[in-house]
């Protein structure tokens, strides 16, 4: 669930949402996460769960086979117009619940599954469904990268206040994110990040896979 009351309702409009994202530095943040965690390569399959207006596409290399879906018809309509003419980009209206029982072919064997700020809009049951869909979509060698807001045990009052302003009503603590992810994935790591954009927001990156992965600690730059 999310809070779209009052001024937050404006963010349901794609152009206002994108303008806000640019103001807070979300474009730079996505690029930094792409460089360090997504590591997508041309020709790979990417599934974007809760894709919004399709902003993540701009941070993927050319030639990626991309499928994104979202419950918002307004966001999907905007995404389709933005990437019209690119046969490698597909946008679908729907939720994880719509696809979990019968995964469409284009969503299978993904090298990368991305969730950019989706899970904190979902209750535990809905979030588990999204994580299970991500697991089902992954190729054996693939990996999931989810970027979310988080509460920390040691966190500045300003950061905690700012995270609490989020439209999503299910921002979780770091231990809660780990517990949730561990119900679906045996192999995952989490990384907390600050200074990713122009706000005091605290992020957590959840990187999960079907098989153990080994790489160095993230250097965000």
What are these regions (language model features)?
Residues 67, 108-109:
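Glycine-centered flexibility motif
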Residues 114:
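A conserved beta-strand element that flanks and buttresses the S-adenosyl-L-methionine
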Residues 102-107, 138:
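Alpha-helix termini
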Residues 43, 109-110:
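Local beta-strand N-terminus motif with an aromatic residue
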Residues 1-43, 47, 52-103, 122-126, ...:
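Class I (Rossmann-like) S-adenosyl-L-methionine-dependent methyltransferase catalytic domain
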Residues 118:
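Hydrophobic adenine-recognition pocket in adenosine-nucleotide-binding enzymes
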């Amino acid at each position: 669930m999310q809070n779209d009351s009052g001024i937050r309702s404006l963010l349901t409009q794609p152009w206002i949402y994108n303008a806000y994202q640019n103001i807070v530095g979300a474009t730079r943040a996505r690029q930094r996460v792409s460089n360090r965690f997504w590591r997508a390569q041309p020709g790979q399959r990417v599934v974007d769960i809760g894709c919004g207006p399709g902003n993540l596409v701009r941070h993927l290399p050319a030639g990626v086979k991309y499928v994104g879906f979202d419950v918002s018809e307004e966001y999907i309509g905007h995404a389709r117009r933005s990437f019209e003419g690119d046969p490698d980009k597909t946008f679908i209206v729907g939720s994880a619940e719509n696809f979990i029982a019968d995964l469409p072919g284009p969503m299978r064997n993904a090298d990368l599954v991305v969730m950019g700020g989706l899970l904190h809009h979902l209750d535990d049951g809905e979030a588990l469904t999204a994580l299970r869909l991500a697991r089902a979509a992954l190729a054996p060698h693939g990996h999931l990268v989810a970027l979310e807001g988080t509460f920390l045990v040691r966190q500045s009052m300003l950061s905690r206040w700012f995270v609490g302003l989020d439209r999503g009503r299910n921002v979780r603590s770091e231990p809660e994110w780990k517990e949730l992810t561990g119900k679906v994935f045996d192999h995952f790591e989490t990384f907390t990040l600050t200074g990713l954009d122009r706000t005091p927001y605290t992020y957590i990156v959840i990187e999960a896979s079907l098989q153990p992965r080994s790489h160095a600690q993230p250097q965000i730059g």
